[in-house]
Amino acid sequence: MSASAVNVNPGRNVVVVGTQWGDEGKGKIVDWLTDHAQGVVRFQGGHNAGHTLIIGGKKTILRLIPSGIMRPGVACYIGNGVVLSPEALFKEIEELESAGIDVQKRLFISEATTLILPYHVAIDQAREARSGAGKIGTTGRGIGPAYEDKVARRGLRVQDLFEPKAFAERLRANLDFHNFVLTQYLGAPAVDYQQTLDMMLSYADRLKPMVTDVSRRLYDENHVGNNLLFEGAQGTLLDIDHGTYPFVTSSNCVAGAATAGAGIGPQKLDYILGITKAYCTRVGSGPFPSELYDADNANRQEEVGLTLAKVGKEFGSVTGRPRRTGWLDAAALRRAIQINGVSGLCITKLDVLDGLDEVKLCVGYTIDGKDADILPRGAYEVSRCEPVYETFGGWKESTVGIKEWNKLPANAQAYLTRVQEVAGVPIDMVSTGPDRDETILLRHPFKV
């Protein structure tokens, strides 16, 4: 084999994952890191999660399109592990292009990506309405039912749109099944076949220029030395397998999902960046050991938790739902680090803790009288966790916009140092505000 046949300088690949229940601030960090990446890849989830970016004081919320779209010249990929609503996609494209951002020439969609259809949305919403107090807290956007169809081999893919006759036949069979569930079990209206067929086929010509073999394209990009950034959605504790089941999302949110959801070999993942807030939040139902505040629970309304919610502007970027807040749970973080193989951490929203008299860190639990130093598996055991806290002095100085570690208040440094000790991996980045430039860099993920 000639030396020229072997690429001695392959591109590096970094995976960004949330280590909590989502909403960790991944979008800002992905955007920040794209100055060293030629491509950004979404590999799971759908338009149920919003990534909020603030660049030059202007706020942008992305739901499907990777955060790299805000950087000129960066290619963006939607992998086969995503479930795609064409309606939501084109709405997002139109919003971005109306702001002068070039999208369609830089966006590439896997032909194997599963489609979200109107009956998925109808089932999602009808189920949630029927569940009453037992609801999971779904966004009602059809994500779960689309993944169900994928696993049941009923799913329709992007590539199926280009075979209209076969698409029509499979759609009819799917609607026979789903309309029976909607009308006979959920007591909801049926979804119209012809209207659905016409709508979905109308997207085919618009989608086709963006559809490609994403897996092959990523391989080729690496081979010529280009760096890729893999952008996770939601968070580890919402993972369908590793989260607080059944209060989870419908996809794998962990770093390993990048391999299956984008079609890249696991040995190609060079660095895993775990994103965690300096405190914790959760949206919807499910156990939350270090919880301080829940607007819907009169027994969980501590003043400091409300302060975190107000200062941190803790409302879902897509749903607008208020988030539950609590102290940073390092025992849960330890679980996420182990599952993801985290190389280093990025702590976000440190500035939200400014002005507190004291800051607490959950370092473990007691469960039925026994000590535990890591989050257990499944919702029922997690719901029995009583947090064990360490308390730190707060700081009155503002950390907003600080870009150097040694300029942080001493108590903030002490708190973060302890988080690093308990987590067992280095803190490589700290976010001190919502803007792209309000960031402390200790080690660059693409240069480690």
Curated annotation (Swiss-Prot):
Residues the record lists as binding GTP: 22-28, 50-52, 323, 349-351, 431-433
Presence of the UniProt keyword Transmembrane helix in the record: no
Keywords, sorted A to Z: Cytoplasm, GTP-binding, Ligase, Magnesium, Metal-binding, Nucleotide-binding, Purine biosynthesis
Positions of the catalytic residues: 23, 51
Residues the entry annotates as binding IMP: 23-26, 48-51, 139, 153, 234, 249, 321
Alphabetical GO biological process terms: 'de novo' AMP biosynthetic process; IMP metabolic process
Note accompanying the cofactor annotation: Binds 1 Mg(2+) ion per subunit.
Residues that, per the record, bind substrate: 317-323
Cofactor annotation: Mg(2+)
SMART domains for the chain: Adenylsucc_synt (SM00788)
Recorded catalytic activity of this chain's protein: IMP + L-aspartate + GTP = N(6)-(1,2-dicarboxyethyl)-AMP + GDP + phosphate + 2 H(+)
Record localization: Cytoplasm
Top-tier EC class: ligase
Keyword DNA repair in annotation: no
Range of residues in the leader sequence: none
Pathway: Purine metabolism; AMP biosynthesis via de novo pathway; AMP from IMP: step 1/2
Pfam family for this entry, one: Adenylsucc_synt
E.C. designation(s): 6.3.4.4
GO molecular function per UniProt: adenylosuccinate synthase activity; GTP binding; magnesium ion binding
List of residues binding Mg(2+): 23, 50
GO cellular component, one term: cytoplasm
Family matches, as PANTHER family: ADENYLOSUCCINATE SYNTHETASE
Subunit comment: Homodimer.
Biological function: Plays an important role in the de novo pathway of purine nucleotide biosynthesis. Catalyzes the first committed step in the biosynthesis of AMP from IMP.
Protein family per UniProt: Belongs to the adenylosuccinate synthetase family.
Name under which the protein is recorded: Adenylosuccinate synthetase
Record organism: Paraburkholderia phymatum (strain DSM 17167 / CIP 108236 / LMG 21445 / STM815) (Burkholderia phymatum)
Phylogenetic classification of the source organism: Bacteria, Pseudomonadati, Pseudomonadota, Betaproteobacteria, Burkholderiales
Gene: purA
